[in-house]
């Protein structure tokens, strides 16, 4: 069995988990609510403040799905209790960002400003014009949003200009010599 799938998921106080028919799982807290439909190869057992994910049979797929379901459920619980955060840095002359409500205005060297509409449940802050902090309860959606913003202007390898994750290292290349 999957080593990750064997570990139980602790339910913090203030978080409730409901498992409906068809493996529809709802994780609720005062901050956020997340819903996800899991594979029919796994079962969820809630008892004594912990959730255990077990495969329905010993097939390779069911065992793999149990580990995946446990990891996703753990991220859902952590997301509704603490939340997730992703930081992006903008490097380049004249490159900047500004958060305005549910939109993010990006100036990235194009002939037009890029207006990125944030999905529901994701908020953006710009403490500095070259810094973006994305926050949300759903780790998957947060990563997708960060990836889409980075996709507008990926860091180039010569000067490092572009949008990058805060912890990202960009390998620099040397310019051609005549």
UniProtKB/Swiss-Prot annotation:
SUPFAM superfamilies per UniProt: Ribosomal protein L6 (SSF56053)
Lineage, top ranks: Bacteria, Pseudomonadati, Pseudomonadota, Gammaproteobacteria, Thiotrichales
Source taxon at top rank: Bacteria
Name of one Pfam family that matches: Ribosomal_L6
One annotated GO biological process: cytoplasmic translation
Record's keyword terms, sorted: Ribonucleoprotein, Ribosomal protein, RNA-binding, rRNA-binding
Name of the protein in question: Large ribosomal subunit protein uL6
InterPro entries, A to Z: Ribosomal_uL6-like (IPR000702), Ribosomal_uL6-like_a/b-dom_sf (IPR036789), Ribosomal_uL6_a/b-dom (IPR020040), Ribosomal_uL6_bac-type (IPR019906), Ribosomal_uL6_CS (IPR002358)
Record-linked Gene3D superfamilies: Ribosomal protein L6, alpha-beta domain (3.90.930.12)
Cellular component terms per the entry's GO annotation: cytosolic large ribosomal subunit
Family in the record: Belongs to the universal ribosomal protein uL6 family.
Gene Ontology molecular function, alphabetical: rRNA binding; structural constituent of ribosome
Keyword Ribonucleoprotein applies: yes
Quaternary data: Part of the 50S ribosomal subunit.
Protein's job: This protein binds to the 23S rRNA, and is important in its secondary structure. It is located near the subunit interface in the base of the L7/L12 stalk, and near the tRNA binding site of the peptidyltransferase center.
């Amino acid at each position: 069995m999957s080593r990750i799938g064997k570990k139980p998921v602790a339910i913090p106080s203030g978080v409730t988990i409901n498992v409906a028919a068809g493996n529809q799982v709802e994780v609720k807290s005062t901050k956020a609510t997340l819903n996800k439909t899991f594979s029919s190869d796994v079962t969820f057992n809630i008892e004594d403040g912990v959730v255990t994910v077990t495969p329905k049979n010993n097939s390779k797929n069911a065992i793999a799905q149990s580990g995946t379901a446990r990891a996703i459920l753990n991220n859902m619980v952590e997301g509704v209790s603490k939340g997730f955060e992703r930081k992006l840095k903008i490097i380049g002359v004249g490159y900047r960002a500004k958060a305005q409500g549910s939109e993010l205005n990006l100036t990235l060297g194009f002939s037009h400003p890029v207006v990125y509409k944030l999905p529901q449940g994701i908020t953006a802050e710009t403490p500095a014009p070259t810094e973006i902090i994305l926050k949300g309860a759903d780790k998957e959606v947060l990563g997708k949003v960060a990836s889409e913003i980075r996709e507008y202007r990926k860091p180039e390898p010569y000067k490092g200009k572009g949008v990058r994750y805060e912890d990202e290292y960009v390998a620099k290349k040397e310019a051609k010599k005549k």
